[in-house]
């Protein structure tokens, strides 16, 4: 079997967001990038450069900074989203980075769904 090209990290995966308690679709669809995509890796490289620079200055990473890095990685996984008839605080959220970040910081269940979807290599594997 030819294994080159088996995983395609640059393709998008449509995540149908499920209710955290019932597992039923809520009507939000998120187009996810793979955690291994170039866009996501740019964020990881930038963060790693920052961590290395801090270490050279003997500065310690705070828990808040580490959490911020994790959220920023999750934001990089979101290529777009469609909220259908759903709203967030009375509005249909746009998929710009600031809005995605704000929502993921406040909604850990949605953050988890996005991270799990982006990091599941099966979602980006050709069958």
Region roles according to the model:
Residues 5, 17-19, 30-34:
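Surface-exposed beta-strand edges and flanking loops
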Residues 1-11:
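Short, intrinsically disordered N-terminal pre-domain segments
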Residues 4-6, 20-23, 67-68:
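A general structural signal for short secondary-structure junctions and capping/turn motifs
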Residues 11-25:
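Short acidic-hydrophobic surface loop/beta-edge motif
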Residues 24-127:
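Short, surface-exposed, charged amphipathic helix/loop patches that serve as local interaction elements
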């Amino acid at each position: 079997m030819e294994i080159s090209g088996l995983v395609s990290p640059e393709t998008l995966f449509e995540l149908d967001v499920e209710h955290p308690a019932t597992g039923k679709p809520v009507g939000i669809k998120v187009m996810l990038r793979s955690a291994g995509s170039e866009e996501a890796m740019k964020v990881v490289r930038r963060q790693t450069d920052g961590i290395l620079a801090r270490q050279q200055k003997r500065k310690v990473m705070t828990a808040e900074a580490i959490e911020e890095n994790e959220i920023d990685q999750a934001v990089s996984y979101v290529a777009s989203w469609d909220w259908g008839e759903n709203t967030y605080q009375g509005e249909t959220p746009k998929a710009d980075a600031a809005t995605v970040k704000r929502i993921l910081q406040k909604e850990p269940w949605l953050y988890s769904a996005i991270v799990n979807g982006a990091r599941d290599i099966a979602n980006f594997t050709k069958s």
